[in-house]
């Protein structure tokens, strides 16, 4: 039981979130701009049940496995000048290859050193390009999740074509690694309005394509629960490092600040810290050293659960009373991921 910050009546988490969400949806229409959901700003409960073992903060790393799945010309990289269309971008493709040759081995060794398991979102073509690396990621105990057939948008596809785009990556990953993905991440998180139904049809447990919360939540889809394990843009290295003056030390401090604030909040609310790593970006020597220091710092604190995203999703489902349940309307009305039917 928790206390709503706007009245003294004791309500469950689901009742509070549901009431505010229903009000937001009721006020929306297809003719109006997308509206953010109204929700509570404070939730209290018994912190012993937030995470396994009474942990007060969950920390989850993603490793984006994309090299080999990018277009041969026009993929984003570190060179500001765009190459002429159709001309192979040799240095940018080599930049992607760095992740496979150097970045992934270095990051996997770092995770082994600290006993941390992560979720690797894999592009099907990248797995075909470097199957041994994909298998090694899984062999070391990390999650193989799906990231599409190639490194490109899929939201503009028809429902059936988007489904095939996802299925192709799932089947490739399962065939090569022996692990069938239950988690999904789209290119820059953009999906069609039918994505939750499609993922549910394909047996997925969760997706990460929404940066709206600092904790997992459930969206009912056709009467069944589907989990969102939210994304964080500002903890994504591909977003952080292009800023002028940003370096490994600044990134380490940003990680610590994020951790410290969420760790403090974790005494009273379920909190989760998500960090997204790209092998070609965070896999460089100095950046791995900064991550090493951050992991040592985070592991020095009591009550921190380092978890794969499939573990977080399953725990959220198994502890539904502590997990926000958001009954959303159609994405065409709310502008947010939800059931399209």
Pin down the residues of each PLM region.
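N-terminal secretory signal peptides
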Residues: 1-11, 19-24
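Catalytic alpha-helical scaffold of carbohydrate-active enzymes acting on polysaccharides/glycoconjugates
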Residues: 39-183, 188-227, 252-271, 275, ...
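Boundary at the C-terminal end of the N-terminal hydrophobic targeting segment
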Residues: 30-38
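A conserved mid-domain beta-alpha-beta active-site/ligand-binding segment of alpha/beta enzyme cores
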Residues: 232-259
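Short, local alpha-helical segments
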Residues: 238-242, 274-281
């Amino acid at each position: 039981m928790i206390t709503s910050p706007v009245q003294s009546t004791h309500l469950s988490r689901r009742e509070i979130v549901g009431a505010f969400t229903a009000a937001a949806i009721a006020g929306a229409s297809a003719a109006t701009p997308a509206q953010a959901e109204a929700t509570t700003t404070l939730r209290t409960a018994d912190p012993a049940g937030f995470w396994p073992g009474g942990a007060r903060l969950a920390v989850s790393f993603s490793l984006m496995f994309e090299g080999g799945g990018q277009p041969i010309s026009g993929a984003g990289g570190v060179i500001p000048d765009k190459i002429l269309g159709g001309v192979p971008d040799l240095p940018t493709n080599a930049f992607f290859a760095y992740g496979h040759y150097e970045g992934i081995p270095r990051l996997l060794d770092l995770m082994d050193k600290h006993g941390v398991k992560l979720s690797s979102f894999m592009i099907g073509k990248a797995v075909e390009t470097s199957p041994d690396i994909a298998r090694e990621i899984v062999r070391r105990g990390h999650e193989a999740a799906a990231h599409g057939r190639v490194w490109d948008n899929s939201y503009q596809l028809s429902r059936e074509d988007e489904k095939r785009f996802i299925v192709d990556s799932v089947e490739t990953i399962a065939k090569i690694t022996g692990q069938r993905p239950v988690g999904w991440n789209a290119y820059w998180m953009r999906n069609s309005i039918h994505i939750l139904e499609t993922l549910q049809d394909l047996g997925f447990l969760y997706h990460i394509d929404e940066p709206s919360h600092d904790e997992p939540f459930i969206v009912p889809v056709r009467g069944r629960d589907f989990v969102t394990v939210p994304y964080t843009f500002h903890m994504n290295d591909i977003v952080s490092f292009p800023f002028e003056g940003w370096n490994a030390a600044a990134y380490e401090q940003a990680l610590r600040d994020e951790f410290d604030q969420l760790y403090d909040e974790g005494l009273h609310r379920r909190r989760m810290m998500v960090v997204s790593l790209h092998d070609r970006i965070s896999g460089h020597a100095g950046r791995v050293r900064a991550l090493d220091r951050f992991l040592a710092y985070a592991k020095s604190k009591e009550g921190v659960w380092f978890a794969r995203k499939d573990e977080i999703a399953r725990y959220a489902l198994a502890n539904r009373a502590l997990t926000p349940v958001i009954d959303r309307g159609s994405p065409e009305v709310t502008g947010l991921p939800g059931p399209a039917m």
